[in-house]
Amino acid sequence: MGFPKEGEKVQIHSYKHNGSIHRMWEETTILKGTQSLVIGANDRTVVTESDGRTWITREPAICYFHANYWFNVIGMLREDGVYYYCNLSSPFAYDSEALKYIDYDLDIKVYPDMTYTLLDEDEYEKHSQIMQYPPVIDTILKRNVAHLTQWIHQRKGPFAPDFVDMWYERYLMYRN
């Protein structure tokens, strides 16, 4: 597996455990790309849902993917602060087509004051039965929910003060 290069524009593809496409982001600019870490940014990019519907993101976002963790984090810059949407997912993979991951339903929404809510537990339970997630996936995801909430409390990684603002400033250099 290679990794995207800084300045490159890539698609992001989200899949479900059964291999079906879940969602695609048309264009994300890579700000940092290594074997273990990818940081990207997008603004008003087209998103295509599995049923073919499309919509456009409303605000600039910084995307954080790590090869060793079963989650990715999107920091969205809004007028009243940075909101984070964290997807419990497989670590990322990258090929010539796109940056890819498997979405495992559970999400954590983090507010500007760093309070958070775990979302979609019912969807996770339903899909784990339908798609027959193996028990090891459940164990890995629960461990990563704990790891992610620890990062939120410690303001570590993408939750560090100024992380999103710093990467957004870098993104602006590519837009001009």
UniProtKB/Swiss-Prot annotation:
Q: Kindly provide the name given to this protein in its UniProt entry.
A: Nucleoside triphosphate/diphosphate phosphatase
What role is this protein assigned? Has nucleoside phosphatase activity towards nucleoside triphosphates and nucleoside diphosphates.
HAMAP family noted in UniProt: Ntdp
By its UniProt entry, which PANTHER family does this protein fall under? Answer: PTHR39159, UPF0374 PROTEIN YGAC
Listed binding positions for Mg(2+) 2 are 105, 107, 120, 123
Q: What does the record give under GO molecular function?
A: magnesium ion binding; nucleoside diphosphate phosphatase activity; ribonucleoside triphosphate phosphatase activity
Please provide the record's keywords in A-Z order. Hydrolase, Magnesium, Metal-binding
Identify the residues that bind Mg(2+) 1: 87, 103, 107
Which major enzyme category is it?
A: hydrolase
Native species = Bacillus cereus (strain G9842)
Q: Does the keyword Disulfide bond apply?
A: no
> Which reaction equations make up its catalytic activity?
a ribonucleoside 5'-triphosphate + H2O = a ribonucleoside 5'-diphosphate + phosphate + H(+); a ribonucleoside 5'-diphosphate + H2O = a ribonucleoside 5'-phosphate + phosphate + H(+)
- What superkingdom does the record give? Bacteria
InterPro entries, sorted: DUF402, FomD-like_sf, Ntdp-like, SA1684
Note the coiled coil stretches, chain numbering. Answer: none
Where is the chain membrane-spanning? none
Q: Which NCBIfam families does the record cross-reference, listed alphabetically?
A: PRK13662.1
Catalytic residues as annotated in Swiss-Prot or TrEMBL: 23 (proton donor)
One Pfam family in the UniProt entry = DUF402
The record's comment on protein family reads: Belongs to the Ntdp family.
